[in-house]
């Protein structure tokens, strides 16, 4: 891992080139394809393998082919390719990959010394948001990206909501006043300035891009974490597994740990984070497991309830209970992290579509898909379902098998989602108490069993008959786990 060779206003960019990732061999390519690839290579090498004070794009040919061959060899060596000096297919594939725009050679020497922050507590402020994501999602992505670095070094990040912060974060369009204009979708994704006064540390994202916390677009956590590495003083790494490797590669925000190479680099600047051990403890002290909530208390409630295969799962805080529907024995608690490590804790809502063999777990503005207890890919945004942007989380969800529709409860209202059409139905949301006679209070969880909908609201569970359209019985929620 390299640290930046100079302090001051060195700017860095992440780029997604406007070309496909596959490239034919230049030897076998048509004249037009050859010319296009050659121009692309010229532009790439001029941008990433030429001093900033040197020639601009388009001057490389006039300087002779030897200069270009040297730069091709530099590129091949950096990425661990066979060093031939030729624009072969493997080299062109690298050139066409989305990447960070900071050069792979040391170009920025505005001030002597390695740029780093001279204090351990840094402030940050998000001054402008993107329409691609909710403000809650953006806040979370930024927070997690900064935590990735603070976990390794003695730096703390404090968010402020007004005034000038050390790291100013914003989503900008086109020319936004820092001499590094954005160029629209799939061009430059973001840029950040090295530690220092003024623009130092500031990080800008192209507002024209589709930002996401998943994979359907550019993952904000991935780009932000990489850019914050530059904002803290790191240059690129030649280790393909490193966060600071030049090319864009999705990183799952949940459970992310800073790779070893990045840890070495950031600790070279700031030193390791010291762990306060506190008072000595007795040898072999037992590990304290999360306490199991006392759901036999008269005021107990559940966060989420769903079927998963042949079992009924009931969630509360960091614990969930597994039971057979028709048995009151063998009910056992488990920690959420032991079976669903990506969820970590506190599930807001859950439901299963048995015909597909998939279940959906909701937490804040995100949801996860499972097959049994196996997670299927990274988290996705709840706005995939068609929720309006003011909806920040789901309180409860229940899948109705006969109409193949899922009801989502938010506050005192509910939405209806058509699972066959994969589309939110019109004329929703509707008031829950007006539509479900006898059900009172906000819905915490819901599940359909044997033609009945069971609504969990605080310490009560309402058994709702869909044919009679009325509640037929009310029991204590705690009775579901044998209390």
From Swiss-Prot:
The lineage of its organism: Eukaryota, Metazoa, Chordata, Craniata, Vertebrata. The active site is at residue 227. One of its GO terms (molecular function) is metalloendopeptidase activity. Zn(2+) 2 binds at residues 176, 178, 191, 204. InterPro entries: Hemopexin-like_dom (IPR000585), Hemopexin-like_dom_sf (IPR036375), Hemopexin-like_repeat (IPR018487), M10A_MMP (IPR033739), MetalloPept_cat_dom_sf (IPR024079), Pept_M10_metallopeptidase (IPR001818), Pept_M10A (IPR021190), Pept_M10A_Zn_BS (IPR021158). One of its GO terms (biological process) is extracellular matrix organization. This is Matrix metalloproteinase-20. Pfam families: Hemopexin, Peptidase_M10, PG_binding_1.
């Amino acid at each position: 891992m390299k640290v930046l060779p100079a302090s001051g206003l060195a700017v860095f960019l992440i780029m997604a080139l406007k070309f496909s990732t596959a490239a034919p061999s230049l030897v076998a390519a048509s004249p037009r394809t050859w010319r296009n690839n050659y121009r692309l290579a010229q532009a790439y090498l001029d941008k990433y393998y030429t001093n900033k004070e040197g020639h601009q794009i388009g001057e490389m040919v006039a300087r002779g082919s030897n200069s270009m061959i040297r730069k091709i060899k530099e590129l091949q060596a950096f990425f661990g390719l066979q060093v031939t000096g030729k624009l072969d297919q493997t080299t062109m594939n690298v050139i066409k990959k989305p990447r960070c725009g900071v050069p792979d050679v040391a170009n920025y020497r505005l001030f002597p010394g390695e740029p780093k922050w001279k204090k351990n507590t840094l402030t940050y402020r998000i001054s402008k948001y993107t329409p691609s994501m909710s403000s809650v999602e953006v806040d979370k992505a930024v927070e997690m990206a900064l935590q990735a670095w603070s976990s390794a070094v003695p730096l703390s990040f404090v968010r402020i909501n007004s005034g000038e912060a050390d790291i100013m974060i914003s989503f900008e369009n086109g020319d936004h006043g820092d001499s590094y204009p954005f160029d629209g979708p799939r061009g430059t994704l973001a840029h950040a300035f090295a530690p220092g006064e003024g623009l130092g540390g500031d990080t800008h994202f192209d507002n024209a891009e589709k930002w996401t916390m998943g994979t359907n677009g550019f993952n904000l956590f991935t780009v932000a974490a990489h850019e914050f590495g530059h904002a803290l003083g790191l240059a690129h790494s030649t280790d393909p597994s490193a966060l600071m490797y030049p090319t864009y590669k999705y990183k799952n925000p949940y459970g992310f740990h800073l790779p070893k190479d990045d840890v070495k680099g950031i600790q070279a600047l700031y030193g390791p984070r010291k762990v306060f051990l506190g008072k000595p403890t007795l040898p072999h002290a037992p590990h304290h497991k999360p306490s199991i909530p006392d759901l036999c208390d008269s005021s107990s409630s559940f966060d989420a309830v769903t079927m998963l295969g042949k079992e009924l799962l009931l969630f509360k805080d960091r614990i969930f209970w597994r039971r057979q529907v028709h048995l009151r024995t063998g009910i056992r608690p488990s920690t959420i992290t032991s079976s669903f490590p990506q969820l970590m804790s506190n599930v807001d809502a859950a439901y299963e579509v048995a015909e597909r063999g998939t279940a959906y777990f909701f937490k804040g503005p995100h949801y996860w898909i499972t097959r049994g207890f196996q997670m299927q890919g990274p988290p996705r945004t709840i706005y995939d379902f068609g929720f309006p942007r003011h909806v920040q989380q789901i309180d409860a969800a229940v899948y109705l098998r006969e109409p193949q529709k899922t009801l989502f409860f938010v506050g005192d209202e509910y939405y209806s989602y058509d699972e066959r059409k994969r589309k939110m139905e019109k004329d929703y949301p509707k008031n829950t108490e007006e539509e479900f006679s006898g059900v009172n209070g906000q819905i915490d969880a819901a599940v359909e069993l044997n033609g009945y909908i069971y609504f969990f609201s605080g310490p009560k569970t309402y058994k709702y008959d869909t044919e009679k359209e009325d509640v037929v019985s009310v029991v204590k929620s705690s009775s579901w786990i044998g209390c």
